[in-house]
Design a protein with these regions (language model features):
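The feature captures the beta-strand-to-loop junction immediately N-terminal to the Walker
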Residues: 6-8
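Helix-to-loop junction immediately C-terminal to a conserved catalytic motif
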Residues: 21
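Conserved ABC transporter NBD signature motif
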Residues: 29-43
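Conserved ABC ATPase "signature" region
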Residues: 76-93
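Conserved ABC ATPase signature
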Residues: 97-101
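Catalytic Walker B motif of ABC-type/P-loop ATPase nucleotide-binding domains
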Residues: 122-125
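H-loop/switch region of ABC-family ATPase nucleotide-binding domains
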Residues: 157-158
Length: 201
């Protein structure tokens, strides 16, 4: 399933994403994953958080190195990394330094890293921010592809177009609280829910 966590800036979307990933500790309440209460350290690796600022997360010398950083490298794992790059349409850039990729390609590479670590839940924070139309469509297509591979994807966004492009369900936040939780069946429903002006947009 691909879920959009939507709402204006400052409503706590990124904070919730970081809490789910175990990067921040909740001040109250509890996080339940797979039917069990999970402490922050228990969520690490199960929930993979991809931040908006990807450059601060790129450490590899090339794309293959980026995917295998932090995992035990074996011939099987190297082959798995190559297959992921192929699936994400990045194999032709395998020898390039990650910093030389476009914004959309970096997003796809970050998805590949999450796949290498076998995280069942992937959170993307504003994955299409700053991307042109072509790259936005490419990233959205890859997100949908990953969902079909059995991953749960949470897309944090304030962009209705991004949510419509790849998400099946939307959860709307306002002032840190959930105000709506609904299936996306078409543009009219989502745009009406978030108060998006269709004539202007």
């Amino acid at each position: 399933e691909v879920i959009a966590l939507i709402g204006p800036n400052g409503t706590g979307k990124s904070t919730i994403g970081r809490i789910l990933a175990g990067l921040l500790k909740e001040k109250s309440g509890e996080v339940v994953l797979f039917g069990k209460h999970c402490r922050p350290k228990d969520r690490l690796g199960k929930v993979w958080y991809i931040p908006q600022d990807l450059d601060s997360q790129l450490f590899g010398e090339d794309l293959l190195d980026e995917l295998t950083t932090g995992v035990e490298v074996s011939p099987e794992r190297k082959k798995a990394a190559e297959e992921i790059l192929e699936a994400l349409e990045l194999m032709s850039f395998v020898k390039q330094h990650p910093s030389t990729l476009s914004g959309g390609q970096k997003q796809r590479l970050a998805l590949g890293v999450a796949l290498m670590h076998e995280a069942p839940i992937i959170i993307l924070d504003e994955p299409t921010s700053g991307l042109d139309g072509t790259n936005m469509r490419n990233v959205s297509r890859m997100i949908s592809k990953l969902a079909k591979m059995g991953r749960t994807i949470i897309v944090i966004t304030h962009d209705a177009e991004c949510a419509l492009a790849c998400c099946e369900r939307a959860i709307r936040l306002e002032n840190g609280c959930i105000t709506d939780d609904f299936q996306i069946r078409g543009a009219e429903l989502l745009l009406d829910k978030i108060g998006y002006d269709k004539k202007e947009g």
